[in-house]
Amino acid sequence: MSKLGALLIICLLLFPLTAVPMDGDQPADRPAERMQDDISFEQHPMFDATRRCCNAGFCRFGCTPCCY
């Protein structure tokens, strides 16, 4: 029984419960903060206003919608 307890203590020290994301950490629970961090695609520096989309090379950097 002491071996099982020692194993449990070692596991809790290596993988604390605080490392697991809690429900309050989800971005869906904080829509105001999520909207402040969200950049509109029209305001993205790599957005092509004449074609109304981003070149395919810039899509890797988070620019959407993509022109293919």
Swiss-Prot record:
This is TxMMSK-03. Residues 20-50 form a propeptide. It is found in: Secreted. The keyword Disulfide bond applies. Disulfide bonds join 53-67, 54-63, 59-66. The keyword Secreted applies. One of its GO terms (molecular function) is ion channel inhibitor activity. The cysteine framework is III (CC-C-C-CC). Keywords: Cleavage on pair of basic residues, Disulfide bond, Hydroxylation, Secreted, Signal, Toxin. Residues 1-19 form the signal peptide. The lineage of its organism: Eukaryota, Metazoa, Spiralia, Lophotrochozoa, Mollusca. Expressed by the venom duct. Both hydroxylated and non-hydroxylated forms are mostly and only present in part 2 (proximal of the venom bulb) of the venom duct, respectively. It comes from the Eukaryota. The modification 4-hydroxyproline is found at residue 65. Its main location: secreted. Belongs to the conotoxin M superfamily. One of its GO terms (cellular component) is extracellular region. Contains 3 disulfide bonds.
